[in-house]
Amino acid sequence: MTQPPRPTRLAQPTQPTQLPWPPERAEPTPPPELVQRAQPTPPLPPTEAPAGRERARPPQAPRPVRAPQAPPGGRLSPARPLRIAVVGGGPGGLYAAALLRRLTPGPEVTVWERNAPDDTFGFGVVLSDETLGGIEHADPAVYAALREDFVRWDDIDVVHRGRTLTSGGHGFAALGRRRLLRILHERCRALGVRLNFRTHAPPAAELARSYDLVIAADGVHSATRQDCADVFGTRLTTHRCRYIWLSADFAFDAFRFEVAETEHGVLQLHGYPYAPDASTVIVEAREEVWRRAGLDRLDERESTRRCAELFADALGGRPLRGNRSQWTAFRTVVNERWWHGNTVLLGDAAHTAHFSIGSGTKLAMEDAVALADHLASCLANHPAGHLADHRQDRSSVSEALAAYEAERRPAVESTQRAARASLEWFENLALYVDQPPRRFAFNLLTRSRRVTHDNLRLRDAAFVTAVEREAELPPDTPPMFTPFRLRGLTLRNRVVVSPMDMYSAQDGTPGDFHLVHLGARALGGAGLVMTEMVCVSPEGRITPGCTGLYADVHEGVWRRVVEFAHDASPGTALGVQLGHSGRKGSTRLMWEGMDDPLPRGNWPLAAPSPLPYRRGVSQVPQALDTAGLAAVREQFVAAARRAARAGFDLLELHCAHGYLLSSFLSPLTNHRTDAYGGTLAARLRYPLEVFDAVREVWPADSPMTVRISATDWAEGGTTADDAVAVAAAFAAHGADAVDVSTGQVVPDERPDFGRSYQTPYADRIRNELGVPVIAVGAISSWDDVNSLLLAGRVDLCALGRPHLYDPHWTLHAAAEQGYTGPGAPWPLPYRAGSRRPPTGRADGR
């Protein structure tokens, strides 16, 4: 039965009777707002909708905008003031105009907006504490007006199959988009900004000739950006879901996520209040679900009615309303550069971030603060902030624009990475709906990797404890210190020392370096310690310094390493990774020039196709014929037998990073026309033959894993869908887990680097196939490990560089979390160091 929402917990704002500022200084009366009337153009679809801020640390306010001062004892320069054109009258453009006009003495600022003053295509806007701190420093008057209208709340409700799970301590603030625009309109008028509504801006090239600075704040469909897309290096990505932006005439009492499981598939609702009597409601579904449900055939009125029916419980039976709302697919905008000459992109014109992580309004207003700050610095270098010489003008403006982009780009790219993770989580929502309810809620809250296990515990310890209890974690046991079983091997914890090439062998023979290196990591507490890629033949080495298992002497030395680890750190498992370099072999040691050919002493290379790794630089490999394929397969078998006799606990087949078996899998490196090339099934044939041959001689009770590159990060290469098919094939042939890496297959790849950036690929394989996965790639903290495990995205986490920085990373993680259980036992000789050493007191006592 439909239930009305529970009583609101919102703070009720007071409604100001007027905006809190008089004109700041005597100004000439600005020209009329509507200097040029034009027919309104059809509105564009909404490009973003706000969502909950995900905060991992206390907010830090940006620097205040600096107003340049006249030289001591000097007079104002008679030179003309700066002339600034702003294309687009959304919040970002308006706020930039107001901030720039506040510079002393103020530039001439003109804004063009093609729509009417009250036209807006969304409802509410969420701004974070960080953004509000920047606004307060940059313009206290705007902050004071916003503060009067904000509604605030702390909770997130996740509704999963009829159960509402609430997590508190998050902290949100929102207000209506129309109210925000009104505040900014009045602020611009008070400061003397020229506002032109229902008016198309002149072409950007024309503006650039007559103005010192042109700010393109004209949104995701920016005409300014499109006119110079090649200069800005624009990349547009349209995503898999359709969404519609609606409103309800009541206030949710929390940020609400709700899932509707229908005969057509899964749809989701994102809802939050933006006024005491109004909420934003966004309904979203994958494209195929949207079409199967017939939503693609409905107009705005029918779409609104249908969405209200789908989420009647969430709405308490109330209706929804639109505002020229239409279904659209979110588009991510990325630009290689944000400015050209004296024209700069701001807000959605420069970058977009999916509404499930943060609003474009938030990013645009932060852009405005940074741009005004750097332009103030530019003007401070000129007498009284005026510009006189045209060439000097443009040079100084260019310096300011370069500084603006340098400051903002890292923050924006970080937000876009988090937004990409979040939107992909919602695209794949159907993979998670069968999770237990609390795990599902935890997974949703940590989807972007910005909110973590430890951070969420700080916000709502009771919620995290309930999630851990549902997952049947032993009391006081972090997720990373729970055991995991692979075939006959039980790992004492979920931490893996990732394979890392050391380039320190002689003729394939490991030495004392490897004993100390791997022995130290075994003593450091990880559940599984992996060797570097161990090569199956002399010709299969990457460099002369790579280890092998192609000679009896190798077997004996590896046995010494394994026995030391087992004896010195009982419970540690040692794994060997077997591989063949393929076309990436016969190169220098990494620190001498990675992927550079040897200057002398080269050996012949083999690959599926005669394609060099770096055209014109690398050696051209020989395409393997039938005899060559059989010979390499037997080399893997012989190395596996030696690995078993050496006592390794686990064997991993290296089918990633562009080495031999990987280059069979990728269409970019496999151009064969025989049975081993063409379709994905054909490209899989040889790696599977090698896997089967190794599995046959590897002890039946010992696990085998396979490492794959889940994407080539290059057009025409392996895709995420391909990776699922590859993982499924290896699992069907007996792989006990898939080690999911990415890239390094072609030199012109474009990886999307970032914190734990490869884990979504592992997540999808695990939850789509039910196959255990090892996640790897920029996982650097124990908090990340706990978050990924408790959310059910991965089974094991492999860390490389953190274990180079700290061989005892796992034991130190246990000490920092106060864990002393069986998942991380300290070796007896080290037990005295199991507590963090005391540090000096600040008072010197």
What do these predicted ranges mean?
Residues 74-81, 143, 376-472:
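C-terminal helical "tail/cap" subdomain of flavin- and related membrane-associated enzymes
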Residues 75-82, 129-245, 463-465:
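Conserved N-terminal helical subregion
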Residues 163-170, 176, 191, 253-334, ...:
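Conserved FAD/dinucleotide-binding core of flavoprotein oxidoreductases
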Residues 460-845:
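Flavin-dependent oxidoreductase catalytic cores
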Residues 1-9, 19-21, 34, 46-84, ...:
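Extreme N-terminal leader/targeting segments of oxidoreductases
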Residues 86-99, 215-216, 326-421:
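Conserved mid-domain beta->alpha element of the FAD-binding
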Residues 116-134:
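Conserved N-terminal glycine-rich FAD pyrophosphate-binding loop of Rossmann-like flavoproteins
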Residues 101-121:
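Glycine-rich FAD pyrophosphate-binding loop
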